[in-house]
Regions:
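Short helix/loop capping segments that flank catalytic or ligand/cofactor-binding pockets
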Residues: 27-28, 61-62, 137-139
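Ordered core of a single globular domain
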Residues: 107-145, 149, 154
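Assembly/oligomerization interface modules of large self-assembling protein complexes
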Residues: 1-31, 50
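Sequence/fold signature of self-assembling virion shell proteins
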Residues: 77-107, 139-235
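Helix N-cap / beta->alpha transition motif
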Residues: 20-25, 130-134, 190, 235
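Extracellular structured ligand-interaction cores
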Residues: 12-14, 123-125, 172, 220
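Alpha-helical scaffold segments that mediate packing/assembly in large oligomeric complexes
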Residues: 30-114
């Protein structure tokens, strides 16, 4: 048994935005008056701005986790860059010409599943992570209509209506959609080998809001957020 060590080096990141109140106030007022379909309403304009900014940052972090590159401003190396640099070439498959679609998705996912070592297959934390377009193609392929050997009406005879945002699996391996993944990408990995690190976890949801009206008379709001983030792959 050989043990190795890898280190996560989180990158310092920050958000420094200037937002005009007018750009957000209409939607905030509608929410505060109860026109929103959501039950949890922002009790103050400041909390609305914090929620708005945090949601945007969360989307960017999700993309960074999969596709980020440390050389780009506001990014750290994601699993795509790390896997290319660290994994043996035999473990990396070329993307299918023309991209993944409902006609080839079963074969392409089969290649990924077949590459999983027998010692790893069946582990409870093994997943196939796929991009949104791959998941969409897989759902459509399982809808059938005489395609892909699934008969005229696919799973349970429901056609393309069979899927209602439930769980997916392939060859007994759970399938997870990585919202930040680029099109046509798939990874087979144990969740316990995929790491995201940050200095303090609550740093990723702490936002400072400065109302500039008392300082310069403008209708601007300055939003400041500082945090660290980085990824690493265990083997």
């Amino acid at each position: 048994l050989t043990l190795d060590e890898k280190v996560i080096q989180p990158k310092e990141l920050q958000v420094n935005l200037v937002i005009c109140k007018k750009d957000l106030q209409d939607s905030w007022e509608a929410e505060a008056m109860g026109f929103s379909a959501f039950d949890n309403l922002a009790p103050s304009f400041e909390e609305y701005v914090i929620g708005y900014t945090a949601a945007k940052v969360a989307n960017k972090i999700e993309t960074n986790i999969w596709e980020g590159a440390v050389g780009n401003a506001g990014e750290f190396d994601g699993f795509g860059v790390l896997s290319t640099a660290q994994l043996p070439g035999a473990n990396i498959m070329a993307a299918v010409a023309g991209g993944v679609n409902d006609g080839n998705v079963l074969a392409e996912m089969g290649k990924v599943a077949d590459a999983v070592p027998t010692t790893v297959y069946g582990q409870e934390d093994l997943f196939i992570y796929v991009s949104s377009n791959v998941a969409r193609a897989y759902v459509r392929a399982l809808g059938g209509f005489a395609a892909n050997g699934l008969g005229a009406n696919g799973i349970d005879g429901q056609g393309t209506t069979w899927y209602t945002n439930g769980s997916l699996s392939f060859d007994g391996i759970p399938v997870v959609v990585g919202k930040g993944m680029a099109n046509n990408k798939m990874y087979a990995a144990q969740k316990s080998n995929l790491f995201f690190g940050t200095g303090l976890l609550n740093s990723t949801n702490e936002v400072k809001v400065l109302d500039m009206s008392d300082l310069d008379g403008s209708r601007n709001v300055r939003v400041i957020m500082r945090f660290t983030g980085g990824c690493q792959i265990g083997t």
